[in-house]
């Protein structure tokens, strides 16, 4: 089943400045993504997200471990934010510097990891769903072939970490679980 993972978000970074509220995510994911039950080439990425921004024409530069990456941000109408996915050689550890570049100048923000020390691994989160939802997981196999792509995303809200574990069937249907990231307990489930 692990070979069917098309996205793992392993860390969340947050920060704000006078003009911007920003997040970044460490991810290993299929890129470009196609919801077809087959995991394509995976890339190591940092996803940048700037929320509540009145300017739509921005670039961003991220710096960590002595390496710099620059990209244009595009508007995402689902999250009402500016976003970019940057393919990187390695993922940031504890923090990164995000510089927002506009026609008015540059503004730097330190984004700090909000991943708690008691957060379980993404694979343990998947195994928790696998152990607690055996009938559902077994229904995803057809002749011993797993018929879904799996997304595992670390989420952070306030002082809490959660995992979103989603199973996409390639036909627009996603069954998802929200887990407490400290112990893998399923908090909620949703079947679209």
Give the predicted meaning of each segment:
Residues 66-74, 106-108, 187:
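Surface-exposed loop/edge segments in extracytoplasmic proteins
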Residues 69-85:
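Aromatic sugar-binding surface patches on proteins
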Residues 60, 91-105:
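Short, aromatic- and glycine-rich surface loops/edge beta-strands on solvent-exposed regions
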Residues 105-116, 177, 189-190:
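Edge beta-strands of extracellular beta-sandwich domains
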Residues 9, 19-21, 47-48, 52-68, ...:
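Short, non-transmembrane alpha-helical segments in secretory-pathway proteins
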Residues 2-54:
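Extracellular ectodomain segments of secreted/surface proteins
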Residues 84-88, 142-182, 190:
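Exposed beta-strand-loop-beta-strand "reactive/processing" segments of non-cytosolic proteins
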Residues 51-53, 103, 166-172:
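Short, flexible beta-strand-to-coil junctions
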């Amino acid at each position: 089943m692990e070979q069917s993972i098309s996205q793992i978000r392993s860390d969340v970074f947050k920060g704000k400045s006078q003009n911007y509220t920003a997040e970044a995510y460490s991810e290993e994911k299929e890129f470009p993504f196609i919801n077809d039950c087959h995991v394509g080439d995976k890339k190591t990425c940092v996803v940048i997200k700037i929320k509540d921004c009145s300017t739509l024409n921005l670039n961003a530069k991220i710096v960590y471990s002595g390496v710099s990456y620059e990209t244009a941000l595009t508007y995402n109408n689902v999250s009402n934010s500016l976003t970019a996915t940057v393919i990187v050689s390695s993922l940031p550890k504890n923090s990164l510097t995000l510089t927002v570049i506009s026609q008015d100048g540059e503004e730097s923000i330190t984004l700090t990891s909000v991943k708690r020390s008691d957060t379980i691994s993404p694979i343990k989160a998947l195994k928790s769903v696998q152990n607690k939802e055996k009938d559902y997981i077994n229904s995803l196999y057809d002749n011993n072939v797993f018929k879904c792509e799996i997304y595992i995303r670390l989420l952070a809200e306030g002082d809490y970490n959660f995992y979103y574990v989603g199973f996409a069937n390639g036909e627009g249907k996603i069954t998802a679980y929200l887990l407490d990231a400290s112990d893998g307990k399923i908090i909620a489930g949703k079947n679209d």
